Amino acid sequence: MTHLMTMTRHASKLLAAAFLAVLMALTMAIMPVFAQGTAERVPASTAEISLTFAPLVRQASPAVVNVYTEKNVTQRGMTLEQMMFGVAPQSRVQNSLGSGVIVGAYGIIVTNNHVIQGADTFRVVLSDRREYAAELLLGDERTDLAVLRINTEGLPLPVLPYADTRDTQVGDLVLAIGNPFGVGQTVTNGIISATARTDVGINDYSFFIQTDAAVNPGNSGGALVNTRGELVGVNTAIFSRTGGSVGIGFAIPSEMVKRVVDAAVNGGTFVRPWLGLAGQSVSFDIAKAQGLDRPIGVMVTEVYPGGPAERAGLRRGDLVTAIDGREVFDEKGLKFLAAIRNPGEQARLSILRGGKAQAINVRVEPPPGATEADVVLLTNGSVFNGARVIELSPRLAEENGLDPFTRGSGIYVHSVTRGTISRNYFRPGDIIRSVNGKQTKTVKELQAVLKANTRDWDIEIERNGRIVRGTVRT
């Protein structure tokens, strides 16, 4: 019995030793494989240790240019010395600079309108330092975009293709390319901070892409580029208390840029499409009443008689939540999404009516009414002599940032001739409401009133949103 127990203990020790040997062998076999998967390795090239935008910059930067302008300013009036010695008033040249983007291979360049506004001559310098004189095809103050053309003598230029900003998301990497402070072409990087900023107060189609890429004076008109080398937008403005970049820049989206460029190339006039409605943003209380879990959309407050919205069946009280699948949150966003369509195209509006979702197709079209060709020069001997006037209409309102629902409520002062009596009393933008107690809804009505043989004129006008009344004796 004792011998048997001794043999059993001996066998157990042998089995344990054998098991331990097998386990160690397996461990040694596995360890090299595990080590090979986790061992650190010296990078074989700089591409493996650096994140670089260099290939993207090489692709995109040749399509970004410097824009220089000159304006001849003549001294107004004469000094005493000039009068005594017969010296003519002196003139001087004002220079300004900005950036631009080549969007057409044969010399079509887009920039900001405020870069070229009022200038007499334009000069474009390419990234390879070639210089060209440029001509202005279109300058649109309300979109703050302008289109220049240079003569390349048939030589194609590098072009930035337009991005579809419907695919742009907050957090996307972008590059800002331009000529800040005139130091030369400069590239900064950042991300998309917001995609639909409407409270910027720069133009009437406020719908901006916000970025934290450094943008400074001189960057205006330059490119905001995505990682595919596409033009996301034209850098336009910054928010700053010091004049320098604080990481809040704004770019006009590529859809609006393309619309203005196409208009410039195809005729030189940017026609603003119109829906024929007015609305207000939705508050939290209105959203709750509509059965929404968050404020979204524009509540229709007015529908222009006979306009596109009325013909399509929209009514006051309808809640427009989206255009072509893109959500809207205020009237500016609504106007922008309509304006990026060509006149005559259909826009699909998603609406809520009585708590029920519907879709309505609206044909966007130019607003009706008088154009620049309908401006009338008043030449009688009255206080209005020298004033150029035109009847209020939706088209005039859209072109001048007025309320398009003011039809038939006055005569718009388009301009005033220098050296005439009207220049003493009227300014461009005034709205003539009544003369000598008679309302003036049409130019013919105003002309009829002005035929009266009188020297006293009781006038009521609207100026900058305020009613001004007064009596003028001639």
Language model features: what each stretch is:
Residues 17-32:
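Bacterial N-terminal signal peptides
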Residues 251, 417, 437:
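Conserved residues at beta->alpha junctions
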Residues 385-432:
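C-terminal accessory/binding modules appended to enzymatic or scaffolding proteins
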Residues 291, 403, 447-450:
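Short proline/glycine-enriched turn/loop segments at secondary-structure junctions
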Residues 1-12:
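N-terminal secretory signal peptides that target proteins for export/translocation
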Residues 34-346, 352-357, 363-385, 390-395, ...:
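Serine-dependent protease modules
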Residues 272-279, 346-366, 385-388, 423-428, ...:
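Intrinsically disordered, Ser/Thr/Pro/Gly-rich linkers and terminal tails that flank
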